[in-house]
């Protein structure tokens, strides 16, 4: 009954809350009542006064953002690496796009391009001097685009799910060459907060707050003249509902940035859900993070193909608890038809036997996935060079350098990877060091690299037969007790075959990758306690969070049985008959924890003893005592 009253008050007070919000942004009211307090309170009539807003101000990059301390607008500080990397990628994308138009961008902290002096012939020097004089005489000056200024020929950016507007404001303050940035969100609270933060950072000339459904907003910009040059999608969970609209609303050759935080689905914990959202079956394997990237790329390309468009991956990152892809979208019927060759589907794969030829187990089939390179190494090199030349631009520059360095070392034409612990645990042997396994592959004339998605990954073009031969040779140096292996186990089947390749585990100098030698920050340690995906933003604010925490505490271990003491356990075990006592082999006697009592024979109701005395007896009354032969 009390819950229904609170809901009724919430509906009656909604117009009052909207009026208070409007007065605040017009500057007529110095303070804004807490929406959560007004929803859970009694209104302005008098019983309970609204509480003041408790806000938190954070500084990230060049932006300063104020947001409610209660969980009314989503914000996760752990994703600062995601936002820093996005700013770096869009900056290089703007450099490429505007450079084709003769516009040079200026990034704070970057040094001016130095002229390189080269040896020229006298005739070439005269031509260069004449050309420079002509340019100076005509008065043509190179056009530039600076940070925080409107570039009429610049990029039109959309952030479909802006929340507090932090990402859009950082674009306006840190990325040069922008024409406008649309910060959209479907929540009225979030849009009000975006407006306030835009005014706080003085970027109203660049950032345009918008309250609309992200899908409808993108569908309304399908015309070629209205499309966005950059679309950034960072939803809470899966971006699948927004992909169809996004591939239509991005301009020709435009940049599409997509984040997926539903890694439990993409990593194979729910194959049916993954197929319904992305059109592919995920495998629960050690290479699940790279497979998640390839599933997302396949899903993007599949949706773009419906509109005679296709995607070209620039950068694909698996970090922390999410994956992030940066792709360019183009139009072309011929390329769309070629997309059928850059995805692998289990239905059209090479013919194989029902069981694996190496371990004897059944195959795991997944996909379809993107089978082509997931990075543009030239573009990655440009981003890496820009971040390395200006390390003070981002707070996570050190990690960006490390991750991008590992990506440049990856084998682009080798999908997925193995892991050291996976190989050694399969045959139950000791794990070789990373340098030993890499050296053995290099000695056998195979290529090998790391993967940014996993710390102990081995990405190689060696076939599975050669890799298992190397592991068989390693097992001979650290023998496994064969008598303990089951004849049907994968370890027994693999080790029962003699290796055809003699592995050489001598350490090679080129086995140690450059990023490892330089000690770059390649893999992130836990940034803070209880880090990871944050809970969804709720209108109830902090009160709702406290109620949810209390509910979690009360339901903790609800399905688990209470622990039993020794007496309860002994009594429970005495209800089970002892199997060895039945066989006559139990030697524990009364010390046995199971029952030695003979089982009580069950007498059916139809089995009446053939005895004249019993047949002449009258039925027993309620007061009669129990007699032998009746009970």
Locate each region found by the language model.
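SAM-dependent transferase fold signal centered on methyltransferase-like domains
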Residues: 2-631
